[in-house]
Every structure is written in structure tokens, then in C-alpha cells.
Swiss-Prot record:
Mg(2+) binds at residues 93, 97. PANTHER family: NUDIX HYDROLASE (PTHR12992), PEROXISOMAL COENZYME A DIPHOSPHATASE NUDT7 (PTHR12992:SF24). PROSITE patterns: NUDIX, NUDIX_COA. The gene is PCD1. Disruption phenotype: The disruption of this gene causes 14-fold increase in the frequency of spontaneous mutation compared to the wild type. The size of the cleaved transit peptide can be of 7 or 8 residues. This is Peroxisomal coenzyme A diphosphatase 1, peroxisomal. It comes from Saccharomyces cerevisiae (strain ATCC 204508 / S288c). Optimum pH is 7.0 for CoA hydrolysis. Optimum pH is 8.0-8.5 for 8-oxo-dGTP hydrolysis. Coiled coil: none annotated. Keywords: Hydrolase, Magnesium, Manganese, Metal-binding, Peroxisome, Transit peptide. Its cofactor is Mn(2+); Mg(2+). Belongs to the Nudix hydrolase family. PCD1 subfamily. It catalyses: CoA + H2O = (R)-4'-phosphopantetheine + adenosine 3',5'-bisphosphate + 2 H(+); CoA-disulfide + H2O = 4'-phosphopantetheinyl-CoA disulfide + adenosine 3',5'-bisphosphate + 2 H(+); 8-oxo-dGTP + H2O = 8-oxo-dGMP + diphosphate + H(+); 2-oxo-dATP + H2O = 2-oxo-dAMP + diphosphate + H(+).
């Protein structure tokens, strides 16, 4: 049973909740929710920080990329061939982007680390460029510890780090605490919550109408200079220029965690903290919408983006999901949830 959130949980408890989590089995086929040439996967890489907190590794996309340039994201990318699994996609792309070895023997022998898969059945999410994004959640830790329990407590101290940037794809690597995403939802009466100091300096959210559907948009702003950052991450050269980051008060550079990356990470943090009841679990991901687009709307097809998709991506306010999805199915989507 997943622990309910009545107090701030330890990193071990957060991980145990993630391991226990089971997404309801999707009634859809793989080709409907993860259609070829529109399918991508990302890896959510968790590890123990300097204060024993659970942190997540994030990247900043290169400005040279055509889509989501300069955005904060997870390591990941698109599938190369039809039968490629989402795990293979995420691990292959993570090796290309940040140097995370796909081979567990290499990770063990050369870097002294192990990687546990925690959640492998997260639902698919829809990106603004009409890709189906499948996340996997993993935990990275040192493999030579005195006790098994230490992997949940001992900070990930890396003397030889695999991390390297692919200048064409990634401009920087950094991390944030997983609990930062939901600390505002935890009970203020709890002493640990009262004393908790989030690393973001600003959080905001608003509703955005995109295609006749309301979307919850969240932003978390983190200063680039962070005393809580892991030393081994600080040794990696930041290839991003100062004009790629936001500037707080005209002085301090910051990174903006928002969009789909923020949505997925928020959901993972909710699961870890036991904040995901059955209703919210049913609202995870965007599989119903992806099916509506692919199966009923003839969108997200392998032969390139449609004129409708291009218009939606470019923000044409005259376009709606109801232009391509049948009325009865749109009614079903809007009855499922009021906010996406």
C-alpha cells in the first residue's frame, strides 16, 4: 500500500511509493498511444543529494535544436525503429546526451554505480509538437556501500562521473529536489514541512486554453548558482550562454522548469509523496487525447505533421481539437477532466 502523505517522507519512503505505484492497465494498443515516428521516451533519473534528499537530474536543451530549444528537459528522444522499446529509447538517448552508460556492466565497472528501474508503467504524455512521450523513473546509486539501506541515505558521491554534454543537444546538466514540486501541497502543520526550504525562488501556475482544452501550466524558477548542487555536477562546463537563461532582478541567472517536463515531474512527485488518489491517477498522462488524435482524428501519423498540427504548434487560435476529433469523443475527453 502506498503511504499517504500526512508528513514529509524520507527518501526511502518516496522511492518505495514509486516502486509500489501501478498505473491502471491501458485499454489501448501500443500503436494508438505511442505511434511510430511520433513516439519518444525520457528517463527521470533520481539520486540522493547532499542532505539526504531525493533529487532529479535535468538537462537544458541546446539553442541549436529545432524544437524546445533552450528548455529544461529530461534526457530522452525519439524511437529509431518500429519495434524499439521505450526503455531502449530512453537509455540510448541518455547515453548520447549525457553519457549515462546503457550497459550496466560499464556503469558498474567503470563508474561504480548501479541503476534501478522504479516505475516502468507511467502513461504517455502529449507534447506541444504532437509527440507521444513515455517516461521511465530510475534510481542511481553507488554500488559499494556498507549496508543496502545506505543507498537511500548516502549522497551520491561520484569521483568519476559519466556525465558529458553533447553540444548539439545539451547545454547544461543540473538537479533539483523532487519534493520542491509539491512542497506547497504538503500539510503546513508538519514540522519538517515548516522548516523545508525549497530551492526554487518563484513558483507560478495558470490555465491556458490550447485548442479548446484548458491546460494547467506550471513554472518553477531555480537560480543557476546553487550551493545545494552536487559537486560532481558543478564540474561539468555549462555551455549555455547568459542570454539563454532568465535573469532574476537583472542580476541572477535562473532556469525555468515548466511545460511538459514540469508536468511529468510534478506527477512523479505526487506519486512519491502519496498525493495521487484514484481520481488523480485516472488523470495521469494524455493517452485518451492521443488516441482521439491518432485513431479518430487521423493526426500523429508517420508521414509528417498535418496542416492542422502545424497550425496548432504555431498557436493558431482559430484551430481546435474538435476540428479533427469527433464530437462524441471530444465530449468523452471533456467529461474525463476539466484541466489537462
Amino acid at each position: 500500500m502506498i503511504l499517504s502523505q500526512r508528513r514529509m517522507l524520507s527518501s526511502k519512503q518516496l522511492i518505495e511509493n514509486l516502486i509500489r505505484y501501478k498505473f491502471h492497465k491501458t485499454p489501448y494498443t501500443r500503436s494508438s498511444i505511442w505511434p511510430f515516428k511520433r513516439n519518444s521516451a525520457v528517463i527521470i533519473l533520481l539520486f540522493i543529494g547532499m542532505k539526504g534528499e531525493l533529487r532529479v537530474l535535468l538537462t537544458k536543451r541546446s539553442r541549436t535544436l529545432r524544437s524546445f530549444s533552450g528548455d529544461v528537459s529530461f534526457p530522452g528522444g525519439k524511437a529509431d525503429y518500429f519495434q524499439e522499446t521505450f526503455e531502449s529509447v530512453a537509455r540510448r538517448e541518455a547515453e548520447e546526451e549525457i553519457g549515462l552508460p546503457h550497459d550496466p556492466e560499464v556503469l558498474h565497472k567503470e563508474f561504480g554505480m548501479k541503476l534501478d528501474n522504479l516505475v516502468m508503467d507511467m502513461p504517455c504524455y502529449l507534447s506541444r509538437t504532437f509527440l507521444s512521450v513515455k517516461p521511465m523513473v530510475c534510481f542511481l546509486y553507488k554500488d559499494k556501500l556498507e549496508k543496502h539501506e545506505d543507498k537511500y541515505k548516502v549522497p551520491l558521491d561520484i569521483r568519476k562521473f559519466f556525465g558529458k554534454l553533447n553540444p548539439g543537444e545539451t547545454s547544461s546538466l543540473f538537479s533539483v529536489p523532487l519534493n520542491d514540486l509539491v512542497i506547497h501541497l504538503l500539510p503546513e502543520a508538519d514540522e519538517d514541512v515548516k522548516s523545508y526550504q525549497a530551492e526554487y525562488f518563484e513558483r507560478k501556475e495558470y490555465k491556458l486554453n490550447w485548442g479548446g482544452i484548458k491546460w494547467l501550466i506550471m513554472h518553477y524558477h531555480f537560480h543557476v548558482a546553487n550551493n545545494n548542487e552536487m559537486p560532481w555536477l558543478q564540474t561539468i562546463e555549462d555551455l549555455s550562454s547568459s542570454d539563454e537563461d532568465g535573469v532574476d532582478g537583472g542580476i541572477f541567472r535562473f532556469r525555468d522548469l515548466w511545460g511538459l517536463t514540469c508536468k511529468i515531474l510534478f506527477d512523479v512527485s505526487c506519486i512519491a509523496n502519496g498525493l495521487m488518489d484514484e481520481k488523480l491517477k485516472g488523470e495521469l498522462g494524455h493517452e485518451d487525447l492521443i488516441v482521439g488524435l491518432h485513431d479518430y482524428g487521423n493526426q500523429m501519423q508517420p508521414n509528417g505533421r498535418s496542416e492542422w498540427e502545424i497550425g496548432m504548434i504555431n498557436g493558431d487560435r482559430n484551430l481546435k481539437y474538435s476540428d479533427v476529433i469527433p464530437e462524441y469523443y471530444m465530449k468523452h475527453l471533456l467529461e474525463c477532466r476539466s484541466l489537462w
